[in-house]
Amino acid sequence: MNKFNLIKNSHHEFYELKENDLIKAEDRLGFLFPKELREFYLEIGYGFINGNNNAINRFLDPATIADITLREDIYEFDPDLDGIYEDEDKLVFYEVNEGVYLTLDLNKTDKSSVFFLDKKIAGSLEEFIKKVDQNDRYFEDMAD
């Protein structure tokens, strides 16, 4: 299907992800990743959106998402996660900067809305990727 190919360019750095690594993270979590995120991982992988040198802009790998969600490893006592990222209907998937993340809505089946804090910034992962490919900080003013 290759719907995420637009993000494969010299401005970004992605790493291949084996399906087995995706399955291991899902087993740890006890649920499947949203359909769009699974497709993205298998088509593109995980890695960095380059643009603003003052930001991390990282699509998190599945193991890190599991660590954050389960509060394990270095995320066990991470105060940045308290309160803001504890909604069971949302999944942290993207690191904007240290301690600042974007989340996906887990209630949708085909398309997952993307949120910056509590503000919806895209109706789907595909829409988010198109926007962030053009401007990696497009959503920052939307949170106000």
Model segments located where?
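A surface-exposed partner-binding patch
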Residues: 1-100
